[in-house]
Amino acid sequence: MAGHSKWANIQHRKGKQDKLRSKMFSKLAKEITVAAKMGDPDPDKNPRLRLAVKAAKAVSMPKDVIERAIKKSQGGDAEDYSEIRYEGYGPNGIAIIVETMTDNVNRTASNVRSYFTKYGGNLGTTGSVSFMFDRVGEITYKPEAGDADTVMMAAIEAGADDVESDEEGHWIYCGDTSLNEVSEALEKVLGESEEAKLVWKPQNRTNVDLETAQKLMKLIDALEEDDDVQTVTGNFDIPEDVAAKLDA
């Protein structure tokens, strides 16, 4: 689940990251191959590839797997993927954005629609919910990078627009076209970030109750387990008391 949300914490505590690790590697490798195919195979000369490689390293993807994904882009047998965004509403009207990378658009569209229908949602048209989100760059640092004031000052100097800090880390937001520039400026002051990526940031988040959270988790699990789905983002947050019950 993309974005700074309690969802990520629940996902971690429930061990979902381990369960999805092989799928995560596969999806990241696909992004690396596509990024390298669309631009230069050298990450230093290809901003999208640089971010993809950084994301792969953040989840400890082996170096040889990363190199193999880049090499695959230069071969004549590299698949052609279409990048399609789907938008809709989940249970209780929660807005959901699903980003996919597929070699069969009909298959993916059918699958995504079926997940929404099965788990109490409704797939809409492109633009039906994205107006409730901002497309921004998100740079993540661990708490050890500094206190909130230190990170805030560094972010302002680097040209960032917003910072969210708590005991689990710092999330720095910037314009989608300035992600690489801001990320590089921050590295000079705070060191290398944990992650830097483009995200759909909700303009407002809705706190959900236990029943809604359970329904949302089923929908998001189904989407994230689909090989064609790269990211899933929603405009909701799960309060700590609800999260504790989900973990029980």
From Swiss-Prot:
Gene Ontology molecular function: any one: DNA binding
Main subcellular location: cytoplasm
CC terms in the record's Gene Ontology section: cytosol
Gene3D superfamilies recorded: 1.10.10.200, 3.30.70.980
Keywords in alphabetical order: Cytoplasm, DNA-binding, Transcription, Transcription regulation
Annotated region (Disordered), positions in chain: 1-21
Transmembrane domains' residue ranges: none
Subcellular location: Cytoplasm
Pfam family, one: TACO1_YebC_N
Domain of life: Bacteria
GO biological processes: regulation of DNA-templated transcription
Keyword Transcription: yes
Family per record: Belongs to the TACO1 family.
Family annotation (NCBIfam families): PRK00110.1, PRK12378.1, YebC/PmpR family DNA-binding transcriptional regulator
Name used for this protein in its record: Probable transcriptional regulatory protein Rsph17029_2308
Source organism (scientific name): Cereibacter sphaeroides (strain ATCC 17029 / ATH 2.4.9) (Rhodobacter sphaeroides)
